[in-house]
């Protein structure tokens, strides 16, 4: 497993979507729990269940697809702020993803929130990832 929990989460979801898997397993941290919760609230995921296996907590994330071709709701998920290069912005410079069709997840003093919520609260933070 990678030492960076955010990249592990983003990569697991991206790989599962590419292979049209129904579910993926992600190790639980406060950060991964927050990211998955936002994706669930925004409708990109179907459901999430937590379970313990060998003393470690994991989340089983059920991915959401539509149509007969099983097209994923998460077309693209991109990791932005990396451990070697952190990306911060204030509320004025928060990017609109696909003109508001996608979301950006930010780590702020309010916790993990979407770009819309950050603009509404007029707060900036670290841009973790873009999803559309």
From Swiss-Prot:
MF-aspect GO terms: rRNA binding; structural constituent of ribosome
Cross-referenced Pfam families, in alphabetical order? Answer: Ribosomal_S8
SUPFAM superfamilies from the xrefs? Answer: Ribosomal protein S8
What domain of life does the native source organism fall in? Eukaryota
Concerning InterPro entries, the annotation shows: Ribosomal_uS8 (IPR000630), Ribosomal_uS8_CS (IPR047863), Ribosomal_uS8_sf (IPR035987)
Question: Where in the cell?
Answer: Plastid, Chloroplast
Q: Which GO terms describe its biological process?
A: translation
User: Keyword Magnesium: yes or no?
Assistant: no
Q: Can you name a GO cellular component term?
A: ribonucleoprotein complex
Q: Which UniProt keywords apply?
A: Chloroplast, Plastid, Ribonucleoprotein, Ribosomal protein, RNA-binding, rRNA-binding
Q: Record keywords: Ribonucleoprotein included? A: yes
Q: Which HAMAP family match?
A: Ribosomal_uS8_B (MF_01302_B)
Family statement: Belongs to the universal ribosomal protein uS8 family.
Q: What is the role of the protein in this entry? A: One of the primary rRNA binding proteins, it binds directly to 16S rRNA central domain where it helps coordinate assembly of the platform of the 30S subunit.
**Which NCBIfam families does the record match to this protein?**
PRK00136.1
| Self-association state and partner proteins as the record states | Part of the 30S ribosomal subunit.
Q: What is this protein called?
A: Small ribosomal subunit protein uS8c
Q: Which gene encodes it?
A: rps8
């Amino acid at each position: 497993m990678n030492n960076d929990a955010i990249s592990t989460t983003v990569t697991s979801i991206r790989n599962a979507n590419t292979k049209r898997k129904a579910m993926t397993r992600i190790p639980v941290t406060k950060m991964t729990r927050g990211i998955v919760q936002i994706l669930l609230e925004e409708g990109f995921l179907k459901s999430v269940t937590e379970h313990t296996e060998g003393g470690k907590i994991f989340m089983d994330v059920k991915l959401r697809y539509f149509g007969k071709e099983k097209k994923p709701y998460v077309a693209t998920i991109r990791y932005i702020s990396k451990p070697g290069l952190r990306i911060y912005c204030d509320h004025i410079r928060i990017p609109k993803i696909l003109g508001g069709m996608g979301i950006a997840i930010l780590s702020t003093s309010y916790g993990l929130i979407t770009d819309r919520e950050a603009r509404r609260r007029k707060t900036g933070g670290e841009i973790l990832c873009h999803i559309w």
